[in-house]
Every structure is written in structure tokens, then in C-alpha cells.
């Protein structure tokens, strides 16, 4: 019985790994035109690597935006940006801008694949007009200091950022 429980736990964990989740999901999709990949989060590199292998020659280019020291090295056709987590930094803004640029390259015939994992709300940042990165950093620091959870932090991030929630449509490409 103990061995059965251990095997069930191992299988459950294996099924939740980002590479398996991405591979299983990609097998269900049809891709048209060139494929552009935007991978954001602490598991972004692993997800992008899996997508790269799966897509092979269909992959046009991509961007990986991940936490510092979470990249495992260069990936062909991908630009890698490491950024601040849990507090966004200048690279979070840089990554957001580069993601917008990449998505805008796609045409109506192309596919844009967005791969998101935990940490993404900090790793890409585009302050709403009238706000600065410093404003968002200060709000984040204060929320972390007072013990706010990620749910509370993300509620405010959606109000302060042009990259969160439905406001992300501002960078929709012609293929959207």
C-alpha cells in the first residue's frame, strides 16, 4: 500500500511538470503560418525549450522572460530576459516591451503561443500612464512587507499595469 501511494504521488508530480504540460497541450493544437512564442514565468525556459523541440522548423522566434538565474542557457531562436521577482525591475519593463514587439511581428496567418507560469505577474511590467516602475515597486514592497498574499498583490497589479488582465489586449497582434 505504501508503494502504491508513492507511485501515485510520483505520477501526479510528473504530470504537473511544465515540460509535460506544454507537450501534452501542444499535441492538441493546430498551428498555422509562422509560430511565435512568448514564454513568461519561473518555468518559462523549460516551457520554451519543450515548445522549441515540438515546433521544430515551424518556430519563427520567441522570447523567454524568467526570474534571474532560472534560465538554463541560450535557446536557438529565443531571446532570453531575466527580470525581477517578486518585485519587478527595469528588465521587467524591457521584457514587456520586447514581448509586445514580438507579438506585433505576427500576421493573421501566424500563430502566437503564450506560455505562462508562476511569477509572470512580476516578470513583465508596463506601468499604466501616469505611473512609474518605481511606483509599482513601492506598492509591491509595501504589500510584501505587510504580509499580503499573491492574490491581493495581483489585484493591485492589475490596476497599475497595462500588461495585466484584459488590458494586455493593447499589444494584440493582427493575428489576434
Language model: regions and residue ranges:
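N-terminal loops that bind phosphate or other acidic moieties
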Residues: 1-163
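Phosphate/diphosphate-binding loops
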Residues: 158, 166-176
Amino acid at each position: 500500500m505504501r508503494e502504491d501511494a508513492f507511485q501515485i504521488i510520483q505520477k501526479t508530480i510528473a504530470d504537473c511538470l511544465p515540460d509535460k504540460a506544454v507537450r501534452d497541450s501542444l499535441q492538441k493544437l493546430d498551428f498555422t503560418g509562422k509560430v511565435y512564442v512568448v514564454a513568461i514565468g519561473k518555468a518559462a525556459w523549460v516551457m520554451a525549450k519543450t515548445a522549441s523541440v515540438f515546433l521544430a522548423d515551424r518556430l519563427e522566434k520567441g522570447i523567454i522572460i524568467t526570474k534571474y538565474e532560472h534560465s538554463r542557457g541560450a535557446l536557438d531562436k529565443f531571446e532570453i530576459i531575466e527580470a525581477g521577482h517578486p518585485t519587478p525591475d527595469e528588465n521587467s519593463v524591457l521584457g514587456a516591451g520586447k514581448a509586445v514587439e514580438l507579438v506585433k511581428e505576427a500576421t493573421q496567418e501566424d500563430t502566437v503561443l503564450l506560455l505562462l507560469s508562476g511569477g509572470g505577474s512580476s516578470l513583465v511590467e508596463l506601468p499604466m500612464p501616469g505611473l512609474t516602475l518605481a511606483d509599482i515597486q513601492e506598492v509591491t514592497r509595501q504589500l510584501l512587507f505587510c504580509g499580503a498574499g499573491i492574490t491581493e498583490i495581483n489585484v493591485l497589479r492589475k490596476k497599475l499595469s497595462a500588461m495585466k488582465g484584459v488590458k494586455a489586449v493593447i499589444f494584440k497582434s493582427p493575428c489576434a
